[in-house]
Amino acid sequence: MVRFVSILSLFGCAATLVTAHDDMDMDMDMDMDMDMNIDTTTSQSIDVSSTASIVPVPHEPKHLHGLPILQSPSLTPAERLYWENYNTTTYFTTQAGNRSALRYHIITLLLVAFVLYPVSLALSAARSRWYLPLLFVNLCICISSVMALSVFKNTFPEEDWYAHNIYGTTSVLLLVFMLVHFFAAVLSVPVSLASKKEYRPVDTIPLNDLESTPVMVNSARGSPSPSSNRDTLFSLSSDTTTATATNNNKRRRAEGEDEGDNTSNHDTLRDEDYDNDDDEIASIEAPPLLPQDIPVFRILFTNTKYQMLAAHLSCVANVVFHMLTYPLFMYIFVDLIIGFAVGNLLGKGIRIFNLLAHWIKGGVFFTLGVVSLARYCGFAAKYGWAWNNISFTSQLTQTRSSNLLFRFAPAGTFTMEFVESFLIFFYGSTNIFLEHLAGNGGAWTAKDLQHVSIAFMFIGTGLCGLLTEYKLNHWRFEHARKRPQTDVVAATPGYSPNPFPAFTIFWTGILMSQHAQSSQFSTTIHTQWGYLLSYGSFFRLLTFLILFLVPNTNSAASKPFTELITSFCLLCGGLVFMESTDQSIEAMEYRGFTPMFTFNLSVGFVSLLMAWEMILFIWKDWLIKTRKTSL
């Protein structure tokens, strides 16, 4: 009985435990359900609030373009340490020194380089009476610019941020060259106080070397015929000039009578153009300028002491003036570039070699682009460098014996391809050991050998170009003459089918575009200017093909449209080349710029520069025609 009661007691306890456990499970389930409900409500509220703040877009940027390099997640500890210590302070960004003086110096130097001096070159080519006044204004602004630089230097703290820089020296030299050039111009420019009525026009005598627009003049037979690419001069009242013009007219009439009535009008016009070419490139003294409108110049030119000084020094002054006119234009930009480098603290220490290598080479291609566009506009047409047909007579070479290009000209003349080949050969010869300057005293690395191999290419292609010019000498002479004439001693069709200058530019672009750099950013920029140079050389070869298939038969500039594209590629390629220095790349990477950012800016700047250069040539042509009709 007792055992039965014990068993019942155990069953009762077990039932109690089961009931308690079920109650606990129910409580736990209820708690869990309540927690899940709370979590669901919370997450729903969070989702609603976050969705309300999101702006829907089709795509979100997932690349690092435009992101400053310090925000890049892929930097190594060594790279992050370098960029955290990167210093962006320069002469341009600091507030030390007289900032107004520095800004004035920068603005005036840019004004001289891009506006005043180029405009003065156009006035000089047009023999305008405003040339000397503008040259004087140019000199005054240059003096004030150098003085402003001196003020900034004296007000800057004692610490020297760029030790042993040469910008101060180059600025002083610029001022000296400006002074010498101005006084040489004052002494060498012929001035006459005679009236306009004393000038008589002489047909088909060139006004200058830069004129490129064909004009209609009265030919010897009394009918209008197209002249060369240059307008007529107004002769001095001298028996020599008048006699020369008279003899030329008689010779043309005699040749016209011998041709007979069966000669077609087309052949007659071509013969007249050929005879006119002799007169067009004939040597003649530049016409005297009319009295200056500015009183100080009128008083100066009538002064007895000035006339005596000019009589003794005019020859020397004339040589100095012509030697400085265009080189001074290039030196202004050299000074400007050096100032940009010093102002941004570029090229300090061993980095000077990387800077010079890129800026010298890039500057050469940029200059070549400027010259190519000028040739398209008619620059140096008297030498046949404007893609124009030209012939030199024995009388011309005698009267221009002081000009070495006329005096020593071979039968095919000195072409622009000859000049380019010589410069390529010279640059390659001097550049062999320059590539090792950064590692002077150490072993030659693979990078040094890779660079010096390009110098070897320059030597080889430059020499091949010179030899090709020698072989094509007779070919140019025969293809330039319109008909046989005994007194023609040199002639050129305006080009030489010499592929080596274009070949050199093409392979320079290809080799450097594939040259591995320290970063992908730098490699991309090298690829950009490498391809641009290659494209430019391709269009230069198309120019040769066009002129070979459709030769230019007169002395007017042929203006092949392919040269416009060539000029753009050389200008833009040279500018991007100069931007690809190590320090320039680092400055752009630090600020998060992309390679296309600088490329876009370069394309826009070059387009504006080309437009400005063409405007200057068109304006110069208009000045020449206006001056001709006013005298």
UniProtKB/Swiss-Prot annotation:
Recorded topology in the membrane: Multi-pass membrane protein
Disordered as annotated region, ranges: 216-274
GO cellular component: cytoplasm; membrane
Parts of the chain on the Cytoplasmic side: 127-131, 192-322, 373-407, 473-529, 620-631
Pfam families: DUF2427, Ytp1
Signal peptide as annotated in the record: 1-20
Keywords, alphabetical: Glycoprotein, Isopeptide bond, Membrane, Phosphoprotein, Signal, Transmembrane, Transmembrane helix, Ubl conjugation
Cross-link position per record: Glycyl lysine isopeptide (Lys-Gly) (interchain with G-Cter in ubiquitin): K250
Subcellular location: Membrane
Sugar attachment sites: N87, N98
InterPro entries: DUF2427 (IPR018825), YTP1_C (IPR018827)
A GO BP entry: regulation of cell size
Lumenal topological intervals: 21-105, 153-170, 344-351, 429-451, 551-598
Biased composition (Polar residues): 220-239
Modified residue annotations for Phosphoserine: S219
Transmembrane segments: 106-126, 132-152, 171-191, 323-343, 352-372, 408-428, 452-472, 530-550, 599-619
PANTHER family named in the record: INTEGRAL MEMBRANE PROTEIN (AFU_ORTHOLOGUE AFUA_6G12730), INTEGRAL MEMBRANE PROTEIN (AFU_ORTHOLOGUE AFUA_6G12730)-RELATED
Family: To S.pombe SpBC3B8.06.
UniProt name for this protein: Uncharacterized membrane protein YCR061W
Species annotation: Saccharomyces cerevisiae (strain ATCC 204508 / S288c) (Baker's yeast)
